[in-house]
Amino acid sequence: MAKEELIEFEGVVSEALPDNRFRVQLENGVEVWAYASGKMQKHRIRILAGDRVKLEMSPYDLTKGRINYRHK
């Protein structure tokens, strides 16, 4: 999939789940499942409940996403 096809959203992590997965509440009120991107896992960037994050989602499945940035 080309990078241009990804849709970016911002939201707040509502729950941290096992296996580096999270439940994220988007700005539009929808709750989705998300996982930390490979570079975030590699650099051991911690994501906790309440953190503001930016995630990308495929237009084909709007229930799952990949977290690619944690706001400070």
Swiss-Prot record:
GO MF terms, alphabetically ordered? ribosome binding; rRNA binding; translation initiation factor activity
Mostly located where? cytoplasm
Q: Does the keyword tRNA processing belong to this entry?
A: no
**What Pfam families does this protein map onto?**
eIF-1a (PF01176)
Subcellular localization is given as:
Cytoplasm
Per its UniProt record, what SMART domains does this chain match?
Answer: S1
Which of UniProt's keywords are assigned here?
A: Cytoplasm, Initiation factor, Protein biosynthesis, RNA-binding, rRNA-binding
Coiled-coil boundaries: none
Which stretches make up the S1-like domain? 1-72
What is the documented function of this protein? One of the essential components for the initiation of protein synthesis. Stabilizes the binding of IF-2 and IF-3 on the 30S subunit to which N-formylmethionyl-tRNA(fMet) subsequently binds. Helps modulate mRNA selection, yielding the 30S pre-initiation complex (PIC). Upon addition of the 50S ribosomal subunit IF-1, IF-2 and IF-3 are released leaving the mature 70S translation initiation complex.
Return the similarity comment.
Belongs to the IF-1 family.
Give the protein name, as stated in the record. Answer: Translation initiation factor IF-1 2
What organism, scientifically named, is this protein from?
A: Ralstonia nicotianae (strain ATCC BAA-1114 / GMI1000)
